Amino acid sequence: MKALRTLTILFALALMCLPAPSAAAAEKPFKLDICAMPEHESFIFWYAKEQGWDKDEGLDFQIHFFQTGMDQLEALPAKQWVVGGTGTVPILVGALRYNTYLIGIANDESWVNAVTVRPDNPALKVKGWNPEYPNLLGSPETVKGKTFLYTQSSSQHFGMSEYLKALGLTEKDVVMQNMDPAQVLAAFDAGIGDFAGIWPMWLYIGMERGNKLIYQPGDVNAVLTLTLVGDKAFCDAHPDIVVKFLRVWLRGVNMIKKEIKNPKLAEQYHRFWTEWAGQDIEPQMAKMDLEYHPVFDIDQQLAIFDDSKGPSQVEQWQDKVLDFFASQGRFSPEEVKKIRGSGYINGT
């Protein structure tokens, strides 16, 4: 995978400098099956298809809707897709059981796997208890013994554990109540719990109802990402197609970075959620979700995948998440070893 990944990124970088091939000059477009979830990263696939960017590269995006990352993986043996976007845990399970590669970072989810509180929570008034994170709110005194609503073994659970760690606490120092995110919001609205671990779109609904952000994993450099995933056999056989796929992806990234404050982009993002994802969300929530998901351009991708001086940032991020889920019993020690030795990131 190291050769593939280097080839892919460098070709994408080189091709960025060349004019895109016209659809008229291309032969019959290559039908590319893409897995997508109702998540931010799928917007680029959808928007690229809407704009005809796939045709510019001689591709024909066939975007397949999956509700979860695990649903995606279960469809892979039948080759229902060969590239796409997936989540934190599925990329690890894919490396373990489905022969997948991590071929890029789709976005940074560190700002949306958040913890919210009610406006009168005393922890909001304490800032900088940990000098390593001067903007972090809360302290051991204002958090210890309190009730946290959360979804066990989720990416948000990982983020919440990092919050407690930054305050010198563990889950044993608080009361943890496990429920799904919709139940978290309903329970918190009913006055249950002191801290609510939650993610979009329930996060934004709660904020509109007056809940306050007290913590986002990015506050303590706990990075959570969504990833671009590829079927190993396909990627090894068709690196040129992977390059073209990434070129379309990077075109979308550049567009988002340039137009992030443009109301018309927010309108398109809202249309994506209502028409493709099938979720009737408020326009303001769509705008927030778009702005809360930083994306990585080619220079940033090269930087975070650079392993010339040791493990890359991507490897470090993935290892930290893997360690957490292993501690939760999601992966056995043998499975952790297999994932790390699979070469799913850089072929080592």
Predicted regions and their residues:
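Bacterial N-terminal signal peptides that target proteins for export
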Residues: 1-9
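Solvent-exposed, polar/charged alpha-helical surfaces in well-ordered, non-transmembrane soluble domains
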Residues: 43-46, 51-52, 74, 78, ...
